[in-house]
Amino acid sequence: TYTGIDGLTIGVASGTDSGGSVEVDNSTRYITYAYDAFTFGFQSNSMDSGTAGADEEYTAYAVSYAVNDDLSISYGYSELDYEGTSTLTDTTQEASAISVSYTMGSMAIAATRADVDNQDGDTVKDGEGYEINVAFTF
């Protein structure tokens, strides 16, 4: 992890899982940067499996904006690429969400709208969701 510039964080990690019958190599890279009321983030992961058609590539980014001390808005987007096999084509899961949150004293209220296409690499699994959350701190 690198944090030598104010507001900037960069990280890289990798590892190998050889506990199962097939070895899997994983790696991740990320960067976040906070400037004034904005925070930006980007992440990329890869999984390389010894099993044919099991590799995955993940990419995501997000941005948030603090309108003031109590109100913030954020947006995120991600893609997860599934490697195909000789009988299955490559597919990409896409997801996005937008959120808004407001804090007033010990109470917080947040709302999110999210969409996903090709969930788990299945081209007929699309969905959307909504959430409203109210939290109290005592």
Predicted feature locations:
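Outer-membrane beta-barrel proteins
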Residues: 1-138
